[in-house]
Amino acid sequence: LFLANNLLVCFVRNDGEPALSMAGMIIGSLSNILLDYLFIYPLNLGMVGAALATATAPLISMGILSTHFLRGNSHFRLMKTKPSLSTASSICSLGVSSLITEVSSGIVILVFNFLILDLSGNTGVAAYGVLANIALVLIAISTGIAQGIQPIVSSHPGKKGQPVRHQIRCYALLTALLLALLSYAVIFLLADPIADLFNKDQNTALTSIASDGMRIYFTSLFFSSINIVAAVFLSSTDRPKQAFILSLLRGFLLIIPAAFLLAHLFGLTGIWMSLPVTEGIVCIFS
């Protein structure tokens, strides 16, 4: 259901209805929240209810997105065609950078957990959990901007489309940087209250570690916003190799060695530093 929903979102967005694509995602996500509450508390279904809500949400989103095809607005048509390995590999190559980004995030979280557990124990791991959850939201902002420009950039190929591509890239980078600045300002000023939202037991050590970590860790937003937009822009302009290299540098080649090295040199502070250092280096290549 998740895969089908994400696939449908991309088809609808690239077929000229980004507003419907956005509506499907927003309503599906809000439905997940509302159904979580309904199934867990009033209906008393517990974890089964949470799982049921999570499975139902993409169905709601897909129902909304399917109206694009039911109204006859779609430009996509099913056709008989012979399987082509070269065509399939060309299509897949454009998605490799996104694949690397998604896979690497889980591996990096695992590595960070082991390093932090050794340095600060369970409290440190819990604090990193706070950062990781907030990072999902903040990174989604840049990802949304990058995915939003993809259909426009892809529809203006060649030399004739270069001025439009350049303009869209500038707008996207400027927007991403401004939102990164706003996000970091909120994090910097409200780090303690934000950490307390995840701290039911009022553990002062957890709040201290998480708030200090946020102020260092999320300086990476200024660089990651550029890197994310750059990777999607490269894929959209049929340059998958460059996009792959950027994603590989961000996902594996730099972040993990940097985490081990900086953790050895600066302890827990070094781990928080490893992400902005990595994103900053990759930004040079972007």
Language model region names:
Residues 1, 42-96, 153-220, 262-286:
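Short alpha-helical transmembrane segments in multi-pass integral membrane proteins
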Residues 1-13, 24-29, 50-65, 143-146, ...:
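Short runs within selected transmembrane alpha-helices of multi-pass transporters and secretion channels
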Residues 2-3, 29, 62, 98-110, ...:
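Hydrophobic alpha-helical transmembrane segments in multi-pass membrane proteins
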Residues 2-21, 128-185, 189-191, 224-243:
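Small-residue-rich hydrophobic transmembrane alpha-helices
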Residues 10, 37, 54, 67, ...:
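Transmembrane alpha-helix boundary and packing residues in multipass membrane permease domains
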Residues 28, 57-61, 65, 85-148, ...:
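Transmembrane helical elements of multi-pass membrane transporters/channels
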Residues 32-36, 62-66, 136-140, 184, ...:
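Hydrophobic transmembrane alpha-helices of multi-pass small-molecule transporters
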Residues 38-45, 106-133, 137, 155-156, ...:
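Helix-terminus/linker motif at the lipid-water interface of multi-pass membrane proteins
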